[in-house]
Every structure is written in structure tokens, then in C-alpha cells.
Amino acid sequence: STAGFYQTDKGVREAINFNVGWRFIKQDVTGAEKHDFDDSAWSVVNLPDGLELLPLAASGGVNYQGPAWYRKQFNLNETMRSKKVILHFEGIMGKSKIWVNGAMIKENFSGYYPIHIDVTEYVDFKKPNTVAVRADNSNDKTYPPGKSQEQLDFTYFGGIYRDVWLITHNHTYVTHPTAAEKVAGGGVFVHYENLSEKSVDVFVNVDVNNEGKKMTVFVQLDLLESDGKAVASSVKEYQLPKKNAVQTHAQ
């Protein structure tokens, strides 16, 4: 990822960099998930964070293995009240639990897939909010890589080792591939057939979810050359009932 510390351009879907200003401690702490927990004595870190710095030759088993905590306070402005609010973690190594304002909203077992969480019902628009993350990279054979770290010839560290985003969008939206829980069906799914030197058939599925009132949506797909010129386009109209979803198909 190239998130750095920059905010993306505003649009229907706004992604705000959430990397800066986390509190961190490399140990387990009782009660750290609570909204009013005092974390003022913890270190301040910016993400991504791999728990520690290790020498160049650091194979599996040399690194710290165990729980660590991250906490961050944030405010939401009134313009977001009509939107869905999403926390998107690109990667938390090991077992993780995530709380917002003291409510546990996600438990995850994998360090390699993103965690895309709808927190709309848990956030406050008038007072500061708190997100707390417990990340545990201890040995656990129930998820990848599936063996003790001492048996590995590499170190996968721990912590929130990839970027984090606060995302807002409308209640009618293109779903996220992992959050949709549809095999090869969430988000935008593209595959190719009949490939030759002269042509190729491009198939695109777009998963659109409507959590608002009944409405008409238009799904537009453009195939662009490297210079940005459109060489093919498709526009389809769909009637979406209240609180319903549709998968669009284009060739």
C-alpha cells in the first residue's frame, strides 16, 4: 500500500487515512478495550507498525510473540451522519479483536486478509470515539501459516502492520470483496475468456447493495487504454428494492 499520511480525494466514497496517532503497548492489559480506559502512559505510534525493530538476520522465533494493544480516539463530523462508517484494516497479524466505544465488533483469525467493518451503529457524532485493537501473534496452528514460528525461516512480526482507513459512503454502494461473504461475488469481479492476439472477452460482475429506500441505480463500466482513452463502455439500469442487493453482469 502507498497510503502514507495522505487523504484520498473526496467523492461518493471517502477514504480517510487512519494511520496517525495511535497509542500502543507491547503486552496484555486488562480492560484496555473500554472506552474510558487511561492509555496516556502508552507509547504513541503511527501505522503501519510491526511491534519492534529486529536485526537483518531474524528468522522465526526471534521476534516477540504475544498480545499487544493499540488504541485511537477520533471524532466524526456531522456531514458523515447520513453515511455508512467503515473501519478498514489492510492487515493485523495473528489473532485480533476490535472494539469501538467498548463494544467488540470483530474477531479475526488471519494476518493476510483485510478486515472491513461496518461501525455505523457504534459511533457517536457528538463525542470522541475510541477504537481498541488487541493483536496476538502467538503460535496458533488453526490459521496460516499453520505451524510454530520457530519452524519458519522467516519472521512475520505482528501488530497492525498495514494501513488503516476510515471510509464513509452512501447506503447504496458497491460491496467490499471480503465483507460481502460471497465466493468470487463481492465487490467488482473480473475474468477473461477467449484470449487471442486480436481480442479477448472481458466479463465483469459488480455487487451492489442497497440499505436505503427503493431507488434506481446505473452501473457504468469503462475499458480504458493505457492513455486513459475509453475503448468500450457498458451502462445498465437497475431497480433496487429497499434493503436489497443485485449482482450486475457485463461482457
Where do the language-model regions lie?
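Accessory beta-strand-rich segments of carbohydrate-active enzymes
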Residues: 4, 8, 28, 65-181, ...
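N-terminal pre-domain segments of enzymes
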Residues: 1-31
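Residue-level detector of high-confidence beta-strand sites
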Residues: 27, 47, 107, 233-235
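Beta-strand-rich binding/interaction modules
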Residues: 100, 198-239
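Aromatic sugar-binding surface patches on proteins
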Residues: 113-115, 243-251
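Predominantly extracellular/luminal regions of secreted and cell-surface proteins
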Residues: 21-49
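Short, solvent-exposed loop/linker segments at the N-terminal edge
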Residues: 190-200
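Solvent-exposed, conformationally flexible loop/turn segments
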Residues: 126-128, 199, 241-247
